Design a protein with these regions (language model features):
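Conserved blade-ending motifs and adjacent loop-strand segments that build the rim/top face
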Residues: 451-467, 501-525
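Short loop/turn segments immediately following beta-strands, especially the blade-tip
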Residues: 385-389, 439-445, 494-505
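One-carbon transfer enzymes
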Residues: 1-356, 360-369, 381-386, 396, ...
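Short glycine/acidic-enriched loop and turn motifs that connect beta-strands
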Residues: 321-325, 375-378, 423-427, 482-485
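Recurrent small/Gly-Pro-centered beta-turn motifs in extracellular repeat architectures
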Residues: 318-320, 372-373, 420-422, 479-481, ...
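Blade-level signature of beta-propeller repeat domains, shared across WD40, Kelch, NHL, RCC1
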Residues: 489-498, 516-547
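Trp- and S/T/G-rich repeat-edge/linker motifs of beta-rich repeat architectures
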Residues: 287, 342-345, 391-395, 448-451, ...
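Beta-rich, blade/repeat-based domains predominating
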Residues: 303-306, 357-362, 405-412, 464-469, ...
Length: 547
């Protein structure tokens, strides 16, 4: 059996932020790594708040208000004592000079080198580390918000909002013998209404990054992890981007206030609802002019349409929600559509005391099955039709104690493949990370996680958007583009490679809401032979009756 990776930690003192403590705990309790050394800076504690490195009064005021408006149950930057997992770990101490740079003597370097480390993980992430990078076989790794190039440094999460970037990124960089490269890169939707929330989502999601990379490094053995970029980032000096000044804050609010007023006015005057649109055509649509619209009653949503067929009739299963969302939870309904396009009113088929949506329906060995989204119950549930399409029974909880959304299954090469978006860390984003599992039995008690999980970590393409369909022997996976907002548009992705060790897909088409008049979002694409269904987010005037 292969020996565990030997890991050292670079720490700034006797405390670490919440996100780092959780990451350290996972590493210490993993099956692939042992923490064998803590290198502790003996100087003054540093402030981990990335917004403090500025002399702008307006920016400080902005931060003060943002914090009070957007308090969260978890502060990923709150300091806490080192995890107890480090109590028996050997320690080496550094000293800090007046210019705040670490002073590292050859004796200290030798002590670290003698520990025969595979990886050094820098939790401080604030000072040059080139001289330590030769002390570990795979260099020094550090997590940072930002994309590692354009956005990095002070006030992470602010500049992406300032420049109207649809995504805000986080990364892990590696330094080996003075050369820096990015080995992990993840993209989240930019939360434009709060810099604090935009930044914190990165730290909460980032709890998982270093443990994942250690798992990947363990599987590779002595082979280094591949870089996520074509070249290397040469600089090892202080990060280049400064905090915003007073003039930039004036510009920021002059542009932001009109957008905020427009948003508030639109929300006051219009009610936005999901509606279903469908086309009776066997082919994948190349244009969307001929789609029929199923408009729900006032104060009602019909979303996440999933198509099925029996005999000559089609059935569109939907999430049905009576507004307001704060007082109601959605259930699963079905709309019957005949071959002439005549539809019947929706019929409720599954209702539980928790939210249900995304009723993924499929057929196997003569029976119809459904996997609705039940993330509020922290389950992935499998139902079987006892009288299709109106009667269903729960036959299996595929997974428990998971926060998983939009689960989609496909049968390929003798295996069931289960795609689902998951939130691993409380408070982190749900739209960013796609996980893949496989099993040879639909009713299995164990679904094997793919070794590359998450196979996608990008809000622009991760979250499933409907049935995986086959065209000319090739599988295509619809996915949501959640960069601008949740469920903005749909990607059609060609699955180029999928087996127990690898997964690869490329986008071949992009369906935007502008294809459907009046729509501002589109987040489901369900195709079967003879019917394609989508859902669109359309604004309706609040004060016009029977609209």
């Amino acid at each position: 059996m292969r020996s565990k990776l030997r890991v050292g930690l670079l720490l700034d003192g006797a405390t670490v932020p919440y996100w780092a403590a959780r990451s350290i705990e996972r590493i210490a309790r993993s099956d692939v790594a042992d923490i064998v050394l803590a290198v502790i800076d003996g100087g003054t504690e540093k402030d981990v708040d990335p917004t403090r490195a500025t002399e702008s009064f307006l920016y400080d005021t902005h931060i003060w208000f943002d914090r009070r408006r957007n308090e969260q149950s978890i502060d990923p930057l709150a300091l806490e004592d080192l995890p107890r997992d480090l109590d028996k770990v050997g320690r080496v101490y550094l000293k800090r000079t007046a210019d705040t740079h670490r002073t590292i003597s050859e004796e200290v370097v030798r002590k670290i080198y003698e520990r025969d480390l595979d990886v050094l993980i820098d939790i401080g992430n604030v000072t040059p580390l080139g001289e330590l990078s030769r002390c570990a076989r795979h260099g020094v790794w550090s997590f940072s918000p930002g994309d590692g190039e354009k956005y990095d440094g002070h006030s992470p999460g602010f500049w992406e909002i300032y420049h109207n970037e649809p995504v805000t990124s986080a990364h892990v960089r590696r330094i080996i013998r003075g050369s820096t490269s990015i080995i992990y890169l993840s993209h989240s939707h930019t939360i434009t209404r709060s810099e604090k929330r935009n930044r914190e989502q990165l730290y909460l999601k980032g709890i998982s990054f270093l443990p994942r990379l250690l798992n990947e490094q363990y599987a590779l053995g002595r082979e280094p992890l591949p870089s996520k970029e074509s070249g290397t980032v040469a600089t090892l000096g202080p990060l280049p981007r400064r905090g915003p000044g007073n003039l930039e804050m004036i510009s920021f609010y002059l542009r932001r206030w009109p957008r905020d007023l427009h948003f508030l006015a639109k929300r006051a005057l219009f009610e936005e609802r999901w509606a279903v649109q469908y086309s009776l055509d066997s082919k994948i649509p190349s244009t969307y002019d001929g789609f029929n619209t199923l408009v729900p009653p006032p104060h009602t949503w019909w979303g996440d349409p999933q198509a099925a067929q029996q005999d000559d009739d089609f059935y569109i299963f939907v999430e049905e929600l009576v507004l307001p969302r704060s007082r109601n939870h959605a259930h699963i309904s079905v709309i019957k559509v005949d071959h002439d396009g005549i539809h019947e009113p929706p019929v409720t088929v599954i209702e539980k005391p928790y939210h249900m949506s995304y009723p993924f329906v499929f057929e196997w060995k003569g029976s119809h099955y459904m996997v609705p989204e039940t993330s509020n119950a922290r389950t992935i549930e499998l139902y079987e039709a006892t009288d299709f399409p109106y009667q269903w029974k729960l036959v299996k909880q595929i997974m428990n104690e998971v926060e998983a959304v939009d689960t989609t299954l496909v049968r390929r090469n003798g295996l069931w493949w289960l795609f689902t978006n998951m939130r691993e860390n409380h408070g982190g984003p749900i739209n960013d990370e796609l996980f893949l599992f496989y099993s040879d039995d639909l009713l299995s008690d164990h679904w094997e996680p793919h070794p590359l999980n998450p196979i996608i970590t990008d809000a622009r393409s991760a979250r499933p958007a409907g049935r995986i369909f086959e065209l000319d022997g090739v599988l295509y996976r619809p996915s949501q583009d959640c960069a601008r907002c949740y469920g903005y548009a749909v990607n059609i992705n060609r699955i180029q490679e999928m087996d127990e060790k690898s997964y690869r897909e490329t986008r071949t088409a992009y369906v935007e809401p502008k294809e459907f008049p009046g729509a501002s979002r589109l987040h489901t694409f369900s195709h079967i032979h003879g019917l394609t269904a989508v859902d669109t987010y359309i604004a309706r005037p609040r004060f016009i009756p029977n609209r």
